[in-house]
Design a protein with these regions (language model features):
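Peptidoglycan-targeting cell-wall enzymes and recognition modules
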Residues: 31-143
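Secretory-pathway/luminal and periplasmic proteins that interact with or process carbohydrate-rich
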Residues: 15, 32-42, 151, 168-174
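Short, small-residue-biased leader/transition segments that mark boundaries at the very start
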Residues: 1-6, 178-181
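N-terminal export signals and maturation junctions of secreted/periplasmic proteins
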Residues: 4-10, 14
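Acidic helix/loop microenvironments that form the catalytic cleft of cell-wall polysaccharide enzymes
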Residues: 30-33, 109, 154-172
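Second-shell loop/turn segments in exported
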Residues: 12-16, 25, 94, 124-134, ...
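Active-site-adjacent structural elements in enzyme catalytic domains
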Residues: 20-35
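Short "domain-exit" segments at the C-terminal end of structured domains
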Residues: 178-190
């Protein structure tokens, strides 16, 4: 379904994702962020040990164990790690969960949702729903790509800076996949 949306529409050309290097970088980043194009909503279903490794700034092991024991653990984790940043309110506001990652690039935070909604002339609530459709997931990724000027990093092969702008917390896990995809696709004829 994503191939249809991305390649049989004007979406990629409209956002100037139109060279082998740009397409390679875009597809590799989206594939990683969406679990191989399978998930349109961020998965925060962590074990305590993983939670401390990925979000160690917010969780020591006892705190991670307490959060992971909650019946609504994904919501609780999102509210903690996304509190007071990206335009979100504090942990009790529920904004972390409300504005957790959605779409192919996992658009995250009240600020990003608000700007994306404004670019389409829709409400934040409508944008949240749209992000979970094939079209919205793809369009939000393209919008984020353009808004953050990521084509320049694809053009120069600066995968590290590009990745930091998308989600710097997972650089080690991404680097091999991204470099491999970038090399393979950028060798394709234009």
């Amino acid at each position: 379904e994503f191939r249809r949306v991305l390649f049989r529409s004007q979406l990629l050309p409209d956002y100037e994702i139109n060279t082998p290097a740009r397409i390679a970088a875009f597809m590799a980043q989206c594939a990683h962020e969406s679990g191989g194009f399978l998930f349109l909503k961020e998965n925060l279903n962590y074990r305590p040990e993983s939670l401390t490794k990925i979000f160690g700034k917010y969780f020591d092991l006892p705190t991670a164990q307490a959060y992971c024991a909650r019946p609504n653990k994904q919501e609780a984790i999102a509210n903690r790690v996304y509190a007071n940043r990206m335009g979100n309110g504090d942990e009790a506001s529920g904004d972390g969960w409300r504005f957790a990652g959605k779409g192919l690039i996992q658009l995250t935070g009240r600020t990003n949702y608000t700007w994306f909604a404004a670019s389409l002339g829709i409400t934040v609530e409508e944008a949240s729903e749209y992000l979970q459709t094939f079209e919205g997931a793809a369009q939000s990724a393209c919008w984020f790509w353009e808004t953050n000027n990521l084509n320049q990093y694809a053009d120069s092969g600066d995968i590290l800076t590009m990745t930091k702008k998308i989600n710097g917390g997972t650089i080690d896990r991404k680097s091999t996949r991204l470099n491999s995809s970038h090399t393979d696709i950028s060798r394709m004829p234009s």
